[in-house]
Every structure is written in C-alpha cells, then in structure tokens.
UniProtKB/Swiss-Prot annotation:
Pfam families given in the database record: Mitovir_RNA_pol
Main location: mitochondrion
Subcellular location: Mitochondrion
Record PANTHER family: MITOVIRUS RNA-DEPENDENT RNA POLYMERASE
Record-given protein name: Uncharacterized mitochondrial protein AtMg00490
InterPro entries (UniProt xref): RNA_pol_mitovir (IPR008686)
GO CC, alphabetical: mitochondrion
Species for this entry: Arabidopsis thaliana (Mouse-ear cress)
UniProt keyword list: Mitochondrion
Extra facts: A stretch of 270 kb of the mitochondrial genome is duplicated within the centromere of chromosome 2 resulting in the duplication of the gene. The expression of the duplicated gene is not demonstrated.
Length: 107
C-alpha cells in the first residue's frame, strides 16, 4: 500500500511543531483497517468462502475456521479451498482482462 502524506503536523505541542491537526492522504484508495473497510472485507471474504463451501458440500454448513495453504495435505476443507481459489482466479481474470492461461504461458 502506498501512502503519501500531503501535510502532517503534530498535535502534541512539542517544540518546532504546530498544534494544527494532522492530515494524511492515501494514494491508492482507503487502506484496510480504517473505518468500514476491514469489516466489509471480512464479511465479503467469508461470504465467498461460504459460497464455495455450498458448492462443495450442498445443504450443509461449513465449520472450518481456517483454510489450508495450497498443496499441504487433503482434508475436508481442501475441496472448499480449491473452489475458493477457482473463484479468486475468475475474479482476477475478469478484473485484469487477461486470461490466466495467458499469464501462465508467459511465466
């Protein structure tokens, strides 16, 4: 995340600093952790995981709290992880306009 500070002035009254409020501008959108970004990210992420779980295990609730890193071992959450990475690849492809196969061919 790139952060560019347009104007920062301290408010603690130390010598050489103004008592004006600090102003910071972010170059690339609102960073996670500020105001509503983090809850919105967490909610949307879990909705995608639950959507993937519904496709793997229809009519059942997915109780895995963590998904494994890729290619570690097989357990019930691994199928959900594979489905989730497939959705992630589709979104990346839709946003970039470049096919994943084209990207893999270049690598």
């Amino acid at each position: 995340m790139a952060v560019r500070c347009s104007k920062i002035q301290r408010t603690d009254g130390r010598p050489g600093h103004s008592l004006q409020p600090a102003k910071v501008s972010f170059v690339a959108g609102q960073p996670l952790g500020y105001y509503s970004s983090w809850p919105l990210f967490a909610l949307s992420h879990h909705m995608v995981v639950w959507y993937a779980a519904e496709h793997v295990y229809p009519s059942s609730f997915f109780f895995q709290s963590k998904l494994p890193p890729s290619e570690v071992f097989a357990y019930p959450g691994m199928e959900v992880f594979n489905e989730y990475t497939l959705y992630h690849a589709w979104v990346d492809e839709a946003l970039s306009g470049v096919s994943k196969m084209e990207l893999y061919a270049k690598a």
